[in-house]
Amino acid sequence: MSEFSKTPLLDTIRTPADLRKLRIDQVRQVADELRQETIEAVSVTGGHFGAGLGVVELTTAIHYVFDTPRDRLIWDVGHQAYPHKILTGRRDRIRTLRTGGGLSGFTKRTESDYDPFGAAHSSTSISAGLGMAVARDLAGGKNNVIAVIGDGSISAGMAYEAMNNAGAMNSRLIVILNDNNMSIAPPVGAMSAYLSRLYSGKTYRTLREAGKQIGKHLPKLIADRAARAEEYSRGFMMGGGTLFEELGFYYVGPVDGHNLDHLLPILQNVRDADTGPFLIHVVTQKGKGYGPAEAASDKYHAVVKFDIATGAQAKAKSNAPSYQNVFGQSLVKEAQKDDKIVGITAAMPSGTGIDIFEKAFPTRTFDVGIAEQHAVTFAAGLAAEGYKPFCAIYSTFLQRGYDQVVHDVAIQSLPVRFAIDRAGLVGADGATHAGSFDNAFLGCLPNMVIMAASDEAELVHMVATQVAINDRPSAVRYPRGEGRGVEMPEVGIALEIGKGRIVREGNKIALLSFGTRLAECEKAADELATLGLSTTIADARFMKPLDVELVLKLARDHEILLTIEEGSIGGFGSHVMQTLAEHGMLDGEVRMRSLVLPDEFMDHDTPTAMYARAGLDAKGIVKKVFEALGKDAKTDTVKLA
């Protein structure tokens, strides 16, 4: 341990067992050093920032009080897990966060025994924790199970389903509500802290359980009134919790999440309890301890590399507008002409571009929170009344509302317009956020129009196309990040439904692209031309309805037909192959190949590296063409533009 170290106590901690050897006064210093280490690490890597700073004391207290990993600690979403990773043997790799071969930006079971359950999507922690608590009870175990969930995540329906189940089972589960928005918390003061400590203690719990037993022998009316009076008296003194009590939880809080003198004894009391479930309401501040993040928590929720002294984030030069901005701006232009257009997002206004629409039309914009199921059916209700809802959701989160897409939208042919953001691979957020499956899970549904934009100009036209579709649902998918820098149209023009376009004419090889891999097809075609292989490039535009005429022409007129998409097996390529099979085109000499994402969950890296590994870049396309020709492409020597 260097005498010049800025983190001398943290330097002694390899695992939480080392932390538990320290005195309480030393734990406070560890928390201060942990916050500094988190700031320095994220300034180098970028990533989710504000939430982690807000739970430094809570993270330290949990690992100090509980016997992790024997006691199971589950973090909802995982945005706040960086301090947890530092304390659990991963500090030496913390500056590899979200890079190829480095640490995940979320909790991950294969990464550490201290991550008993993986996370990235919200509101799963209580359900998983309850499952682990029941498994413990069935096995006769005594360990604790702790689920930490934020005030945003707990608003989702799944969290309430889990709490309702846990309360009914009287499970010995500990839920810690990390309230960093002050959305349901009253002011936190000394009296509140004292009462929380008192009510979490054994004496009060014993008296309360005794009261319950006595109540069983009283007339029901008297027993019910006594229980209700006890609940409301604590609700009045504690400033809340009645809802959680109604769900069967023993509520403790609110507690100052940055005060270890308050946190430690409460966690110790709950740890030693033999009843449950508990909900500890902890109030924290996003970005705590770093001035710029405290002042602008929204801007420092997730960051790129930044200068610690100033808080200034590194900004790459932009050569083209982002797809998100193009979508938002296009929707605004359409809505200026049509007052039936409304925008819907599930807690992702800036990520989807709906924030641009909201600035122009605040009364026609609806952020429903972390509630994708509700968002879809809410949109269906609007569509049923003649409005034109644009439901902007990340591909990975649309998975959470799939039954609603089928049951409430598609079966009824309601014209909900889905703007599917983050289609394809997303890079640093890895498998949990990849938009890999929407081609497959939407493509199998009747009554759907499915489009993919090959560039930002095409997205403008596809938004206009969706506005004009009033007899069935539609979807347009597009990736994260910037477009290609193509010339932008002044206005969007509705496309002919189910018709693709020829981008370049050839006679030997046909590349049929669905989505933004079109740019890589053009590079591959240039290379193939230098090798004497004349190549046609087609932009499918539509996966459903498929341009059957175009598919058959490409198959008849070329020796090789290759489909390319940013999606899993079962998507666009499968639809093309089904069409060829139905027309007897696979019985003859047509050689058709399909380039899709590999049948695996791909770990995080840069999108460029991930697509290269998937074989979905120009080099991979050339290689696949030569494989279909039965020749050696000698890809090591292929020089791509």
Curated annotation (Swiss-Prot):
HAMAP family: DXP_synth. Pfam families: DXP_synthase_N, Transket_pyr, Transketolase_C. Its cofactor is Mg(2+); thiamine diphosphate. Homodimer. This is 1-deoxy-D-xylulose-5-phosphate synthase. The keyword Nucleus does not apply. The gene is dxs. It catalyses: D-glyceraldehyde 3-phosphate + pyruvate + H(+) = 1-deoxy-D-xylulose 5-phosphate + CO2. Mg(2+) binds at residues 151, 180. The keyword Translocase does not apply. Its EC number is 2.2.1.7. Pathway: Metabolic intermediate biosynthesis; 1-deoxy-D-xylulose 5-phosphate biosynthesis; 1-deoxy-D-xylulose 5-phosphate from D-glyceraldehyde 3-phosphate and pyruvate: step 1/1. Catalyzes the acyloin condensation reaction between C atoms 2 and 3 of pyruvate and glyceraldehyde 3-phosphate to yield 1-deoxy-D-xylulose-5-phosphate (DXP). PROSITE patterns: TRANSKETOLASE_1, TRANSKETOLASE_2. InterPro entries: Dxylulose-5-P_synthase (IPR005477), THDP-binding (IPR029061), Transketo_C/PFOR_II (IPR009014), Transketolase-like_Pyr-bd (IPR005475), Transketolase_BS (IPR020826), Transketolase_C (IPR033248), Transketolase_CS (IPR049557). GO terms for biological process: 1-deoxy-D-xylulose 5-phosphate biosynthetic process; glyceraldehyde-3-phosphate metabolic process; terpenoid biosynthetic process; thiamine biosynthetic process. It comes from Rhodopseudomonas palustris (strain BisB18).
